[in-house]
Amino acid sequence: MKKIVVLLGMLLAPWFSSAVQAKGEAGEFDYYAMALSWSPEHCAIKPADRDQCSRQLGFVLHGLWPQYQRGYPSSCTRERLDPAMEQEFAGLYPSRFLYRHEWEKHGTCSGLSQHDFHQLASDLRQKREDPGRLSVSCRAAAQKPLPAQGGSGQCQRLAGPGQHHGGLRRRWRFLREVYICLNKEGTDAVTCSDEMQKRELPSCGQPDFLLRTVR
C-alpha cells in the first residue's frame, strides 16, 4: 500500500499562486496534483459563486494539474475547450467556469486530447475513496480549532493512513483543499515534490485544523 502524505496548508490565497509558472511544453511535466476542494470553505470565501454554492457539496474537483518538481507549466497551447466536454463529463466540476479554465490553463499541458484528459480526471476523482493508492497533500484555508489531534485525525479519515504534517499560516485554519499527487499516467501515487512540501511546512507545523460543515 502506498503511503499517504498529508500536508495541512491553511492559506487564504491559493498555494499555487506563489509557485513558479512556466509556459511549458504539452506533455512535458513530472507528475499530476489533483486538487479536491472542500466546497463549504470555498463558499465561505466566495459566496457569490452560485453555480457551486447553491448546492450542498462536500469535496469537489478543482483540477488535475501537471506539475514540475519546481513550479508548474501553464497554458501550453491555445486550444479552446470543446463545449461537448461539459455534456460528456457532466458533473465533473462544480461550475461551468472550471471546465474552460482548467482545460485551458492546465489540461493543455497534459499532452492528452480533451476527451482523454477529462476521462482521466473523472476516473481519478471517482477513485478518491481508495486513498491507499494515493499520495495526498491537504490544504486548509480557520476559526475554531479541532482538538490537538482532531485536525490530523480528520484529514487521516479523509485521506487514509500514512504520514501527516499539519499546520496553519496567517491564522487561517479551515480545511480548504486536498492535493493528491500521482504519476503522469495517473496509475500510482507519488510523493508531492519537495518544493510543495517545503512551501506548506510553515502551515503544516500545527496540530489542528477546522472543517466547515456542509449546509
From Swiss-Prot:
Pfam families: Ribonuclease_T2 (PF00445)
Subcellular location: Periplasm; Cytoplasm
Residue numbers annotated as active site: 62, 102, 106
Signal sequence residues: 1-22
UniProt GO MF annotations: ribonuclease T2 activity; RNA binding
Top-level taxonomic group: Bacteria
Main localization (coarse): periplasm
Full protein name: Ribonuclease
Lineage, uppermost ranks: Bacteria, Pseudomonadati, Pseudomonadota, Gammaproteobacteria, Aeromonadales
